[in-house]
Swiss-Prot record:
GO cellular component: plasma membrane
Domain of life: Bacteria
Protein name: Putative cytochrome P450 137
Residues that, per the record, bind heme: C422
Entry cofactors: heme
The species this protein was found in: Mycobacterium tuberculosis (strain ATCC 25618 / H37Rv)
Family annotation (Pfam families): p450 (PF00067)
Amino acid sequence: MVLRSLASPAALTDPKRCASVVGVAAFAVRREHAPDALGGPPGLPAPRGFRAAFAAAYAVAYLAGGERRMLRLIRRYGPIMTMPILSLGDVAIVSDSALAKEVFTAPTDVLLGGEGVGPAAAIYGSGSMFVQEEPEHLRRRKLLTPPLHGAALDRYVPIIENSTRAAMHTWPVDRPFAMLTVARSLMLDVIVKVIFGVDDPEEVRRLGRPFERLLNLGVSEQLTVRYALRRLGALRVWPARARANTEIDDVVMALIAQRRADPRLGERHDVLSLLVSARGESGEQLSDSEIRDDLITLVLAGHETTATTLAWAFDLLLHHPDALRRVRAEAVGGGEAFTTAVINETLRVRPPAPLTARVAAQPLTIGGYRVEAGTRIVVHIIAINRSAEVYEHPHEFRPERFLGTRPQTYAWVPFGGGVKRCLGANFSMRELITVLHVLLREGEFTAVDDEPERIVRRSIMLVPRRGTRVRFRPAR
């Protein structure tokens, strides 16, 4: 009876039913899973003997209800709560900025960031910097940092501008289309040019195609299902992923060899060339396989999240005309302050990823509660970004809140935090500002739909339900 109730999508959305389900389950184990004698966090019940069934029911409920349901649970149980979830095991969900700071600043041998990557590791690959633990992660990160920060970003601006203009020439005029769809193509074009240093359109398409195939697998429900069934070999035997990786190897390894043999390597400024030239503290180079793995990581991570953010920014701007006018004024007259505030606010209310995670390698204390080894600790980005304790009118789109002030480190976490914070955050911000300015300076856009888009989950991403439908015409 309890299990059937939990499996129902209504069970964790209706407060009365949620309370009754929890109460019945609590009776079965003598009490609801509240802070126990050892100081464990509160959370959903999972009676001994039925734990796997409850974990499956909770997983189904989450997949059916997504972040809306999770936010209701967070409001019920507080800033840290626990629940078992099929394929993830014991999960502790952190939804408070102070506790997020504890997670992000914990020793790297206590909380493992690579283990926390979860389903995405199946797409990035076991050699990706994302899934490495310390000290290997830090070694690779230091070598990858220079091409994505500081003066290097300025060199990419003309590439981004030219790609944006070229893309606009292919868009339908005065007919509805999904901004998310064209943003994906645009961002892939940009990232391929920036990373590989190519500009011939046919070569860009040839390099981009296998990455696009791999990325499509990463944003499909197939990834979610295969990750849940990974112990049955669903990830080991995945022909579509194997084909995409083989195609990537064919194009990338050949490019690496060409670049190593290039006598003018030192004059090039693309990311591939900088990685081939990079030397560690002891003079060591990255191997071909390490470069390949990191290039895959950069292409995939720098593509979908940025495209999704651009689509969300358009959805919000087109339904907030005053903000749209201010961004357009900066695009035409110069300045970036309000545009930056718009992107920060977009990432606050519409982060492309709902969460980031670590795995406890040993017992630790978070928020005064004991968390056992093996627990997956999930920092819930949406809950933290929309905290009423930090933000006035937290659910409203108000870019002005970020004018003249930087987002708080642990109360604004769309890029994660700690040593695993997104390496490409600065590049993403520069890319979004540049693309927005070109589009709004050289194009006119209107919303197709009267109401803002609903958030829906696509695998590990949160995207606009209809892809942000717009009408476009070149500016007069």
